């Protein structure tokens, strides 16, 4: 199990890379994360949802994503509330304090998922969340040491040297955590090193001496990781330097933005710049396309959009004939109204939309979770639905997409410049991307996004084989586990 000295130390990428490296060695491997908190989710083969990182790790293992790979998923809706997903299904909404009290009761379900995976493969590579050093969260923990001790899984601690202070982070973690938790840690990995690793030899030895743990290696900065789907909001930034020769695509960063990995394929296109617009900045007037992304709290994010003045920028863009694409929550915002009579996003509420599509949305209890395929803009696509709303109105008579089963999705305005769709993953298909970019007079490169992700995973796996003692990690993972595994083995 990889745990970190903090968030964003690179655990997700390391797990994905290790999964691919072990698969290439001929082992049957599966990923697992007991508890994740993310608004970037993926639909699984068994019709549920899990964190995007675990779906990527499944790809690295060359298997279909399954809800057992991430049994507990928290999707933040507001500063103090999250939607609770257990085994891929919505179980309710919890406040921060409620979850801290309730999470211990979920340990049995977490262990049930882990044990099913363990029986189905040679090695389960587990990813922790945040850090075990957050000792204020230790009681009832199911994400890090609470799980590791219950399941008897050895832990390797990951430290991020790029942010500085890695010696203190690793040695400090050892100092403050419970001795029984310390006993679970079998070593450490230094991640995100830039330059010659030999320059850190003394520091590496000092960590080994001060912690009493062995080091498994120093991983360099992995540039290939930038080509993988994004999960954490910390990566929201422009993909490359601006150039006047490239058309600009702008996307505002909403407070509860979700599934923003929808936009990742655009980073591969040399004819466009994807600019993620942070709060406090206007949407650039030179944008050829504005994309309104998914949202976990659509009405609140629509209010935030207006508070930033982005609605004014969007209306001006529309008057100039610019293109606008709304995805899921962004699609709902483009309509005339959004109603949440039963308070699925918090308290019961309603809001006027931007009115650029003649449609109205009502949120309801049923959550659509399914893979879909069909035609959009004359091009084939594959993607998935993940939403809790029903949208109707005159503009749906000109749908954005028609599914293979004949169902219609989304809407297009009468002028043919505003598009809305509930489908995530649309832009991963090269032909659809080409059709959209041609509306901007941009010739798409036809890059196979899926192949690009596969190549990036192979590159990362090769780097880990070179810089980590994977033989020792395999031996650690294959070592005999405790004779009895706690509750959940047969659930």
UniProtKB/Swiss-Prot annotation:
CDD domains, A to Z: CobQ_N, GATase1_CobQ
Residues of the active site: 328 (nucleophile), 424
Domain of life: Bacteria
Cell wall biogenesis/degradation is among the record's keywords: no
Domain GATase cobBQ-type: 246-432
SUPFAM superfamilies named among the record's database cross-references: Class I glutamine amidotransferase-like, P-loop containing nucleoside triphosphate hydrolases
Pathway info: Cofactor biosynthesis; adenosylcobalamin biosynthesis
Gene3D superfamilies assigned to the protein according to its UniProt record, in alphabetical order: 3.40.50.880, P-loop containing nucleotide triphosphate hydrolases (3.40.50.300)
GO MF term set: ABC-type vitamin B12 transporter activity; catalytic activity
InterPro entries according to UniProt: Class_I_gatase-like, CobQ/CobB/MinD/ParA_Nub-bd_dom, CobQ_GATase1, CobQ_N, CobQ_synth, GATase_3, P-loop_NTPase
BP-aspect Gene Ontology terms: cobalamin biosynthetic process
Alphabetical keyword list: Cobalamin biosynthesis, Glutamine amidotransferase
Similarity section: Belongs to the CobB/CobQ family. CobQ subfamily.
Physiological role: Catalyzes amidations at positions B, D, E, and G on adenosylcobyrinic A,C-diamide. NH(2) groups are provided by glutamine, and one molecule of ATP is hydrogenolyzed for each amidation.
Protein name (database record): Cobyric acid synthase
Gene: cobQ
